[in-house]
Amino acid sequence: MTDVADLDESSILLLSPPMQSATDETCLDLLAQDDPERENVLWVTFTRSPDSCIQDWQGHVGDHPANLRFISVGDTLRSATGTATTTGTSANAVIETLSNPGDLTGLGIQISEVLQQWQDNDNRTVACFHSLTSLLQYADVQTVYKFLHVLTGRFNTAGVTAHFHLDPGAHDDQTINTLKSLFDAVAEFDDGEWNVRTR
């Protein structure tokens, strides 16, 4: 495990280019810090299919989490808004879709509903938001900032450990610095290693 994976902060920003094996490993390590069979895993994905996420999980972690929920945003499934299905890859994985990637209100509602469904079980809840770079293609920085301010607060209140992916090469310094201020920890992948800053 990397040092990043040992973070227990409520909200973590991962600054790394896409297609980095170190980023994928750290993402999975953050999602599987404890016994996976006692975890609720929420995966919000704009660009990756739930099946590819499940395959990565099985190859890296092995054991299925107690609850696995995907919110697949945009064209990753090409399904109707709000559809919930169970994937054949993992019997306990539920996939919900949101067809409009710019619908932050709808996304916030779906995330809140998942957290509410899990609030009474004793499992640890972890989340991955993949990625803010994709979200910023559909909404401006200030709108995303407001959305994340509410979302990170909601995660903190619910005791969720969440990490958010952002490609630093796709955004200017002002955008990155604006978003950094929302997170308890920022991990940046540079020269083959993670540099971590916490507040």
Identify the meaning behind each predicted range.
Residues 165-199:
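Phosphate-binding/switch region of NTP-binding enzymes
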Residues 37, 64, 181-183:
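Short, structured coil segments at secondary-structure junctions
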Residues 42-47, 70-73, 163-166:
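Short internal beta-strands
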